[in-house]
Amino acid sequence: MRRNVALLFGGRSAEHEVSIVSAGNVARALDPDRYAVTPIAIDKETGAWRLCPPLAPGEAPAMVREGPRVAFLPGGGGRLAVLGETASVSEPFDVVVPVLHGPNGEDGTVQGALDLAGVPYVGSGVIGSAAAMDKDVAKRLMRDAGLPIVPYLVAGPRRGVAYTEAVEALESRTLFVKPANMGSSVGVSRVADAGQFDQALAHAFAYDEKILIERAVPRAREIEFAVLETAEGEVRVSPPGEIAPAAAHGFYGYDAKYVDPDGAALLIPASLAPALAERMGGLAARAFEALACAGLARVDLFLDPDDPEGIFVNEVNTLPGFTAISMYPKLWDAAGLAPPALMDALIAHALARHARAVATGRAAPRSAADAAWAPMRESISR
């Protein structure tokens, strides 16, 4: 019997387009013999959730601007309220796969709605998603857990920061300015003088009202690990990968990631001494646990080639990209876990976590929702 899977994609975020690409790869990785996939597109401008036609095997979802609006019903056990020419209630979905990047999708908002709906979903819950999304909060939690982080300052509406102040506090003239709640390097700038700094702040404030100002780590190597939590709760860490940006870009920004096909080289596995790779992988697992993550995450670290102790946890991404150049699926593929098996593992974790929540009274069993919604038999054709 195939499981009914809702694939959430799009979203009201600057990473909307990246989500669409990721969703196509996730859809193709879901075994059609095991899963019946129904995409739900989230409009970038309005935030409306719209039901898409079920996918044929190998088909990628496409953004739709018309069609029925939908919402998961609180206490509905995975049922959708469908508002088209008439109103109806869908048959329940067994699991939701959110392929959403950035605010309004990766930050705990959607996860909270899915918890209220009583439906299993892939990835971290509300706390882990929200904590990892806010880079300031994440760094505080990791620092409190004894993890090494790059020194930084926070700027915002009530806290202005001048370039001279940042240089003195962070002991570096070269700084990174970035929105606290954004991914895919959107809004990130590298600066080395006051003019660049002011421009970078204005650019970052276009995406968020909280801004991080970080000390640059000269010639830092960016090492990434894919973390996967099994259905039994075991936290597994992949071999390391390395991002080597092209010299023309200077750092791994949005253009290097998604615009320039030669913007960076992905080195899998990264060339690290075994002991160093093990140490950095251990830090990745600790970061995953410090932020209360679940299911999956990509953990990015910096390695200072001039300092044997220069290892820093940069950030934790709880819904990493699944594009053709995304490190998370590539790392697991290189470790022998192909995308279809990876998706099987993620869905198994989602179902097992939800079952544990039911067993401890933190979620209602599907049977309770079935009984409550039995009078409403009208459903959409899927």
UniProtKB/Swiss-Prot annotation:
Cell wall formation. Pfam families: Dala_Dala_lig_C, Dala_Dala_lig_N. Signal peptide: none annotated. Binds 2 magnesium or manganese ions per subunit. It comes from Methylobacterium sp. (strain 4-46). It is found in: Cytoplasm. Belongs to the D-alanine--D-alanine ligase family. Disulfide bonds: none annotated. GO terms for cellular component: cytosol. It is an enzyme of class 6 (ligase). Its EC number is 6.3.2.4. This is D-alanine--D-alanine ligase. Pathway: Cell wall biogenesis; peptidoglycan biosynthesis.
